[in-house]
């Protein structure tokens, strides 16, 4: 007979893949920094200022509402800067920019706009705090992912512009030839079209086992910050950076919309702004600006920051809130998740947030 009192108990320990670690300690020890660490530091890409104090609010405290027109103003002003420089060059020289020069101008502007938006969001975070801040701080870039995050962010602004220039840039078309009368409609339709393709691709990534393995890294963060919008496997990043925008562009052309290079540039700035702010977790009621938000709001289908934040917080294989530009397709296909802090009765429309221009 076996002596059960002398039996040794063997406990199995499940070891986590080190590549899945979200531990972030690198900001406190500069001795091991690489070029990527210094880029984040010198460009000021941190969402949280270690020297500042982030306010913390309970979920029942009112959440301030954003003046959406200030988001449009910010995006359009920053999109207009390279267009104005391009126009000035044409006027001064009588020649248009070549392909390489156009790529250099617009891809650089893309990167600078993203850096400036990050600075603004850090300032807003110091003023208004972050969603679910009473339970958990925002995730930082993990020690194992610093280089990957920066390389993917650079790739976004680089390869999107390579694609746009290759497909749409015409040496005989200057910024003054932009289809201004179509631009407001194109901005709104493009975000909805991008979101249609993204919704189904994103939903399939969650529901299909062979695809989930390419998306799970992105869901290691439960309280993301904007830089972690690029924390994903290469297969996902390929679709995010070029695949989905290309499908949306083809759809727009099939609809008969002009969608030339300059209009696409402006649409890209709207999409990139929404991707960044949607991963910011800022405790403000606002999010993806669109020229058609007035229509989306009639169906409770506009997207605010909390929507994608909840997707990360509670989503894994089974999830909700798959859209990243609107809630239209989530609303149509029944995958909306109830808001917590951005519910209508908890929004303070008297306490308005203005997006700083500088």
Task: For each feature predicted by the language model, list its residue ranges.
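Non-catalytic, topology-defining segments of multipass membrane proteins
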Residues: 1-216, 220-258, 321-358
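C-terminal transmembrane module of eukaryotic multi-pass membrane proteins
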Residues: 257-346
